[in-house]
Structures are given as structure tokens and as C-alpha cells.
Design a protein with these regions (language model features):
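Bacterial N-terminal signal peptides that target proteins for export
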Residues: 1-6
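Bacterial N-terminal signal peptides
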Residues: 7-16
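Bacterial Sec-dependent N-terminal signal peptides
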Residues: 15-35, 563
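Short S/T/G/P-enriched beta-strand
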Residues: 27-66, 72-99, 188-248, 256-257, ...
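Conserved small-residue
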Residues: 39-148, 154, 159, 165-166, ...
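Conserved hydrophobic/aromatic pocket- or pore-lining residues that grip, position, or stack substrates
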Residues: 180, 258, 289
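Beta-strand-rich extracellular modules
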Residues: 183-185
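Inter-heme linker and motif-flanking segments adjacent to c-type heme-binding CXXCH motifs
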Residues: 187-192, 213-245, 262-563
Length: 563
């Protein structure tokens, strides 16, 4: 079934993107200054991109990997500078990971290009994405792998790299690497960073919709007998949809043509008249299926509880997945999806949001808007070791006694995010984590990693952090951006002091008379907290402290009162 309703939006945005990233590639000398070097910070915006394994029956999501990037000029004197498109360009190229897996082309790896026109109204060459980005080996020229400049976010952006989770040797790799390089006007490479482009086809329907399964019980109606189980399941979905909704769907079907999804509204025009008459894609998937997860876990991890195994998690029945496990990284061992997002009914907007629950306040009291009214860092990271807002019905605390274990209050069926705007860990007002910036104008994701993949994550995720600062984990080394040691004080990210030997020599002077500025991270008893852990193993003043060591006064010497 042809779905041209999105064609105009895709075409308009595609033409705008083809206008280039601005900049024309002027040399970056003005931004770098004397003695400058460069760093490229880049990350996938979501931490995972789901893509249909086949587009022959219906499509939920196309190949569309988004990467944000910033270029920092390091200076031997003075602060570093974040460069714009008038000073530098950013391009990407394929690079092998430590196992030798490389993904440079999408040609021959999917039937997407066969169905792009009837599904998305886009006439594309093989290897070309919906907004004009290309896979490196498929691109007809450098423009196809050059990032544009996103003026609204003030960074470089690659919208919609059409990558699939199959490498050039035909092997499955859902976490392939791509090299993002800053180049000057002559095309000379100034700096590069290797970044994961996470992508997974593990968005399967067959667990429930394959013939004979719970949603396609034998004898109920004439189900598909396609030998390909995923194709069979998808055909059964259309059969069931026709029976329930009175439709007569003809493949290929773009689900979002009726069920609005902001992820596919690239022009940002909002739902069409046709879409307004139907539930959003999130509602018809999450809320509708919420009571059909018998035997699966659709609840947050309780204090002291363990994270359910991947095959038992409700979200992983459709999101990638029991094998992919796209929720990975620093929080994975303590929480599951529901600790942040709430259960499936909440995600689908079955209950109205509480006051302050919507991203901009305009949607309070209404069903949550997919892709916008989402959990925030400040919801769990609401305070520090000495200050945390009083929250009625506050969720339980994590074992560290500082962070909330859930992002919403107890008993809230809407899972409205807790607001703690004064927290040192809060996003910018009215912005999601993935759209916020912090210290020095860097994107939050540039230093902490992608949403759902906060460093440390899997080995390929950790490559970027290791290249930028010498070890995995969040960017915590001042030297990642500062050639000259930053000045003493608490002007670092989230009010941090400088890291390294220079601070060891200077911290006593700072502590004397300013103990209250130490306690938010080192604790009221100055014995250290989770907020004062070592980012890496280092030797300071002759004492070696392992990564993860909680540092307080007593780690190295007596406390502030001589005890």
C-alpha cells in the first residue's frame, strides 16, 4: 500500500540537508589559536537505533542512525574552544573494530531500497539515506558523508546514516564503529574519534504473532504459512489488524502513516488529519500490549532486587532485544527500563501526566507525548550527598543513599518524571538529556555517552572514551580538553574540582575555610561517597588509588578535625 503522506516532509527536509552543513571548510586557526590541537566528541543520539529486518510487509522504522558531533580546539594557553561550521567540517568513514569487523556499505544487506518509494515516498539510490546521508563505500562523493550544522543545537549532525547490523563480511554486528574526523579547508584531518553506530533488527513480532502463538492461535482465522517466521508474523499482524479494525491493508504498509510517530516526523509538522484520527504509534504499541505480557517483567527493579534476565523483560520482546540488550552501560546492573520510563501502560500514555510531568509544562494532565515527555537525569540524580529536594511520595533510594531508584514517585501510574531543576545534575530547562549541554558548551552525551549507553558500556562503545581520555568511562579527565591545567576551584562539570596531581597539592588550601563545598561529593562525614569515586587508577602523592575507589579525607590522611 503506497504511503505518500510523509513524502513531502522527507523531501523538504532532505533538500534542506543537501544544502550542506554550512561552513565551506575554512581553516580552524581562528578557533584553535596558537599551539592548538583538536578533539572530536561524537555520539549516537539515542544509544540504539531499531530498524526493520525486512520492509516487504510493513515498516516501523527505516535505517536512520543519527550522530551528533562537536570539535574542540585545545590551547596551550587559555580555555579550549568549541568550533563551528565556519571553522571546520566533520566527516565519517568506516573503520574496523578490534575483531576486524567493518561496516562500510549497506548495498545488498536489506530490501529497504526496493520499498523506500512506496513506503516513504522517497526515490533513493542504493546506499542513500532518507536525508541524503550515505554509507561511506556507497557515497558518490565527500558531501554524502559530511555532517551538516544543526544551528538549533549548535553542533554537527549526521541525520539518518542508513546503516544495517551486518558487516561487510556478512556477519551480524549490532555495535559497529564509524570514524568521525574533523577536517580543515584543505581536507586535512585534524583529529578523529571512533564511535559506535548502534543498530539492531531485533524488533521481532514472531514471539507472539507467529502462527500458532498467542496472538495467532491455530484455528482462529487463516494465518500466514510463510516459512520465514518473521515475515509470517508480520503478515499475521496485518491479518489481525484487518479483522479487528476493518481495514484491508496491502503490503508494504508504513505503520506511521496512520499512527503518528515523532521519530518519523522529520519536518516537525505534527500529526496529519489522518493520523489525528488514530492512536499514536507509542500508544497502540505500548498501551495496547501492556496487559498481554503474561509471564514477563514489566515493573521496576525494587531495592535490593536483581535485574531480570533479558528474555524475561517485557520491553525486550519488541525493543532490541534479548540478544542486543540496548539498555547497557553504567546503570544496567541496578535498574531496568521501568525504573526510568515506568511500565508499558505509562509509556503508552494510559494515565495523564502529573503537574510538571511534561517536558515543557504544556502537556500536564494529558497523555504523555512520545519521544518528548520522557524521564530526566535530574529525576533520579535529584541531589548530592548533602542536599536533595523533598518529594512527596518519593521513590526508594539506591544503595548509595543519594540517588532515587525510580524516576517517578510511588504509585504514579503515569510515571511522570520528578523535577529537580536545582540539581547539579539537571538538564537544561525544557530539554532532554540528549539535547542538553553543560560544561564548556559540550553536549551532555559527549562526556557521559549516549542515552541508554552511559559509559562504560560494551567494548565498542568504550572506544571513543578511551581515545579521548585514555580509559573507558565518563569523560572525567581535565586533560581531555585542557592542555593547560584548569584553575583551582569548583568550575568543572557539575561543580567538580580539577582532577590530578595539581589538585592534590592545592586542595588543602581550598578545604580550609570551605569544607561545606567539599561535602556535596565527599559526604558530610568527609569519608567519601559514590560521587567521589576515582575515574581511573592513578598514583597521587605516592599513593595508588584504583579506579572506583571512594575518596574522602581519610583515604590519605586525618579528617578535617584531626581525627
Amino acid at each position: 500500500m503506497a504511503r505518500s503522506i510523509l513524502a513531502a516532509a522527507f523531501t523538504a527536509v532532505s533538500l534542506a540537508a543537501c544544502g550542506g552543513g554550512g561552513g565551506g571548510g575554512a581553516t580552524p586557526a581562528g578557533g584553535g589559536g596558537s599551539g592548538s590541537a583538536f578533539k572530536v566528541f561524537a555520539n549516537n543520539d539515542l544509544g540504539m537505533h531499531c530498524v526493520d529486518e525486512s520492509f516487504a510487509v510493513f515498516s516501523i522504522l527505516p535505517p536512520y542512525n543519527v550522530v551528533d558531533a562537536q570539535v574542540v580546539a585545545l590551547r596551550s594557553s587559555g580555555p579550549p574552544a568549541v568550533l563551528d561550521a565556519s571553522q571546520v567540517q566533520v566527516r565519517y568513514s568506516a573503520v574496523a573494530d578490534a575483531t576486524g569487523s567493518i561496516n562500510s556499505t549497506s548495498v545488498g544487506k536489506s530490501d529497504f531500497w526496493q520499498y523506500a518509494l512506496p513506503l516513504y515516498g522517497a526515490s533513493l539510490a542504493a546506499g542513500q539515506g532518507l536525508q541524503g546521508m550515505w554509507m561511506p563505500a556507497d557515497a558518490p562523493g565527500a558531501a554524502g558523508t559530511t555532517l551538516g550544522w544543526d544551528a538549533s543545537m549548535g553542533l554537527f549532525k549526521a541525520p539518518g546514516i542508513p546503516i544495517f547490523p551486518v558487516d561487510d563480511a556478512g556477519h551480524l554486528n549490532r555495535y559497529p564503529l564509524m570514524r568521525f574526523s574533523a577536517v580543515d579547508g584543505s581536507g586535512a584531518v585534524l583529529a578523529s574519534t571512533d564511535v559506535v553506530l548502534p543498530v539492531s533488527e531485533e524488533t521481532s513480532c514472531q514471539s507472539c504473532h507467529a502462527t500458532g502463538k498467542a496472538a495467532a492461535p491455530t484455528g482462529a482465522m487463516a494465518w500466514s504459512s510463510d516459512p520465514d517466521l518473521e515475515a509470517q508474523a508480520r503478515k499475521n499482524v496485518l491479518i489481525l489488524h484487518d479483522a479487528r479494525a476493518g481495514t484491508a491493508l496491502q503490503a508494504p504498509v508504513l505503520c506511521a502513516s496512520c499512527h503518528y510517530s515523532p521519530a518519523l516526523d522529520l519536518a516537525g509538522t505534527g500529526p496529519s488529519a489522518q493520523q489525528q484520527g488514530h492512536g499514536t504509534m507509542s500508544a497502540v504499541m505500548h498501551a495496547f500490549h501492556a496487559d498481554k505480557m503474561a509471564g514477563l517483567v514489566d515493573a521496576p527493579v525494587a531495592p535490593g532486587g536483581g535485574v531480570p534476565s533479558a528474555p524475561l523483560q517485557a520491553c525486550y520482546q519488541c525493543h532490541p532485544g534479548a540478544t542486543t540488550q540496548c539498555l547497557r552501560g553504567a546503570m544496567t546492573t541496578k535498574v531496568d527500563c521501568q525504573n526510568c520510563h515506568g511500565g508499558m501502560a505509562a509509556v503508552g500514555g494510559a494515565a495523564p501526566l502529573r503537574a510538571g510531568g511534561s517536558m515543557d509544562g504544556s502537556n500536564d494532565g494529558k497523555p504523555r507525548r512520545p519521544w518528548l515527555d520522557l524521564p530526566r537525569c535530574q529525576s533520579c540524580h535529584a541531589g548530592d550527598a548533602v542536599a536533595r529536594p523533598t518529594v512527596a511520595g518519593a521513590p526508594p533510594l539506591a544503595a548509595d543513599g543519594i540517588r532515587f531508584l525510580n524516576a517517578y514517585v510511588n504509585g504514579d501510574a503515569s510515571a511522570s518524571p520528578i523535577l529537580a531543576a536545582s540539581s547539579r545534575f539537571a538538564e537544561q530547562p525544557g530539554k532532554l538529556y540528549r539535547k542538553s549541554k553543560g560544561h564548556g558548551g559540550l553536549a551532555c552525551e559527549a562526556c557521559h555517552g549516549s542515552t541508554h549507553a552511559i559509559w562504560s558500556a560494551n567494548p565498542n562503545d568504550d572506544v571513543a572514551a578511551t581515545q579521548l581520555q585514555g580509559h573507558a568511562g565518563v569523560i572525567g579527565e581535565c586533560s581531555a580538553c585542557h592542555q593547560a591545567p584548569p584553575s583551582e576551584g569548583l568550575g568543572g562539570p557539575h561543580g567538580m574540582h580539577p582532577v590530578g596531581a595539581a589538585w592534590v597539592e592545592a586542595h588543602q588550601d581550598r578545604a580550609e575555610g570551605h569544607l561545606s563545598s567539599c561535602s556535596p561529593c565527599h559526604g558530610a562525614d568527609f569519608r567519601g561517597t559514590v560521587l567521589s569515586r576515582m575515574f581511573s587508577t592513578r598514583t597521587l602523592a605516592g599513593r595508588t588509588l584504583a579506579a572506583g575507589t571512594v575518596v574522602g579525607c581519610y583515604t590519605c590522611h586525618d579528617g578535617p578535625n584531626g581525627d
